[in-house]
């Protein structure tokens, strides 16, 4: 077998492979003999069909199968011989086959980039230093009460966290625009659902009032024709409702799994959940900074085949989230996912090199700890731990999580890490915006 390697462009490679004529001849002969043992042709007993008839009837398809198999086998042998690491599926370009002559074909593919890590000592990471205090617990309890609140109609003027029912009609330069009109629109204020200035314009008005508010669409608004535009909204305020918070009664507290229904028990349970959430947020904040620094310091070429594969993964995940099927997933625009897909591939390649360079293996004690931490959020943690231990795929997924954490720790060992005091709410807001 003869092999030549050509670099086409960037990570692209083209192998030209020649398979000796005798190798093809013997393979075709072997397959025809095997076929002759099982074919049925009228006038002949099974296994006694003359070889010339077998070849006449099945020769073309056998040759096609043999050539396809020869290309695949020869490609594998060639990349092993040339020490090439292909990325993605290869594209076979068959040559013309002539009986008695060597068979030459080409294979086009991409290779993984050679990654040489640099700039690790220049990575800067701020480690959040924060504790859950009593005020944080109070705030969370207020949030829980708000989530369980009821609404009561009031005749006073609307306030910042009321719920209102309105009719509105938006216009720009006197012309109404698409999507700018609604009737009996129910809005729980204070959640940032509307553009800046809209909710503020409702505050101070009572049910039954009709008025106009002036707003400006943000420069980064999703609708291109509205970005940065000044608009007027004609408002009819139909109803104002105020939130009625439930008291921390024994019955209310037991809804959250606190068996004794005590305020102290609820506070302890809330604090435990907040501390678990905080631990994960700190971990993710540090990890994000370390990986961002790694990516910034190491610009690498990325095989298009890997990006294509990751785009398909993201498409399917998006379709599943919204109840779509395989066909609908593939119809989602590629540009929605391409940037994220490329970053995921880059991060995977760079972290893979960190793991390889540091000869890292998943720490089973860490894997166990990660599973226990995750299970602690469920009603029966031991049942979740047992479920994981019996599921090979889930265990391997958790080993990958542990290995990624170990790779991040290897980065942090060389990075410039400084501590920064912050609060629970600040850190959680940063996490939600990331």
Curated annotation (Swiss-Prot):
GO terms for cellular component: cytoplasm. The keyword Cell division applies. Pfam families: FKBP_C (PF00254), Trigger_C (PF05698), Trigger_N (PF05697). The keyword Chaperone applies. One of its GO terms (molecular function) is protein folding chaperone. PROSITE patterns: FKBP_PPIASE. GO terms for biological process: 'de novo' cotranslational protein folding; cell division; chaperone-mediated protein folding; protein transport; protein unfolding. It comes from the Bacteria. Residues 161-246 form the PPIase FKBP-type domain. Its EC number is 5.2.1.8. It catalyses: [protein]-peptidylproline (omega=180) = [protein]-peptidylproline (omega=0). Keywords: Cell cycle, Cell division, Chaperone, Cytoplasm, Isomerase, Rotamase. It is found in: Cytoplasm. It is an enzyme of class 5 (isomerase). HAMAP family: Trigger_factor_Tig. Consists of 3 domains; the N-terminus binds the ribosome, the middle domain has PPIase activity, while the C-terminus has intrinsic chaperone activity on its own. Belongs to the FKBP-type PPIase family. Tig subfamily. Involved in protein export. Acts as a chaperone by maintaining the newly synthesized protein in an open conformation. Functions as a peptidyl-prolyl cis-trans isomerase. This is Trigger factor. The gene is tig.
């Amino acid at each position: 077998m003869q092999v030549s390697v050509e670099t086409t462009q960037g990570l692209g490679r083209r192998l030209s492979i020649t398979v000796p004529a005798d190798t093809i001849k013997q393979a075709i002969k072997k397959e025809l003999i095997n076929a002759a043992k099982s074919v049925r042709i009228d006038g002949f007993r099974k296994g006694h069909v003359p070889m010339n008839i077998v070849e006449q009837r099945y020769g073309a398809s056998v040759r096609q199968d043999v050539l396809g198999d020869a290309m695949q086998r020869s490609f594998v042998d060639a990349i092993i011989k040339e020490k090439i690491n292909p990325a993605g599926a290869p594209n076979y370009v068959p040559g013309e086959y002539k009986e008695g002559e060597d068979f030459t074909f080409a294979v086009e593919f991409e290779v993984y980039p050679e990654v040489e890590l640099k700039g690790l000592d220049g990575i800067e990471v701020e480690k959040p230093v924060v504790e859950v205090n009593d005020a944080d617990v109070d705030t969370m309890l207020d949030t829980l009460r708000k989530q369980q609140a009821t609404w009561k109609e009031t005749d006073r003027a609307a306030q910042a966290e009321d719920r209102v029912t309105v009719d509105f009609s938006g216009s720009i330069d006197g012309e109404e625009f698409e999507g700018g009109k609604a009737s009996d629109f129910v809005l729980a204020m204070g959640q940032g659902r509307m553009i800046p200035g809209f909710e503020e314009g409702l505050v101070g008005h009572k049910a039954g009032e009709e008025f106009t508010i002036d707003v400006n669409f943000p420069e980064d608004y999703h609708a291109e024709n509205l970005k940065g535009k000044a608009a007027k909204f004609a408002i009819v305020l139909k109803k104002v409702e105020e939130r009625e918070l439930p008291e921390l009664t024994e019955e209310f507290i037991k809804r959250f799994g606190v068996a004794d229904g005590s305020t102290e028990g609820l506070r302890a349970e809330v604090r435990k959940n907040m501390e678990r959430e905080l631990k994960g947020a700190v971990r993710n904040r540090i990890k994000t900074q370390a990986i961002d620094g790694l990516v910034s310091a190491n610009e690498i070429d990325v095989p298009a085949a890997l990006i294509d594969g990751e785009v398909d993964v993201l498409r399917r995940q998006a379709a599943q989230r919204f109840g779509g099927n395989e066909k609908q997933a593939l119809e989602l625009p590629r540009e929605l996912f391409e940037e994220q897909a490329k970053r995921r591939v880059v991060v995977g390649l760079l972290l893979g090199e960190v793991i390889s360079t540091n000869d890292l293996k998943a720490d089973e004690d860490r894997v166990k700890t990660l599973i226990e931490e995750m299970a602690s959020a469920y009603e029966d943690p031991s049942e979740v731990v047992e479920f994981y231990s019996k599921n090979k795929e889930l265990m391997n997924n958790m080993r990958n999580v542990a290995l990624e954490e170990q790779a991040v720790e290897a980065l942090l060992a060389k990075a410039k890490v400084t501590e920064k005091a912050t609060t629970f709410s600040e850190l959680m807001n940063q996490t939600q915006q990331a």
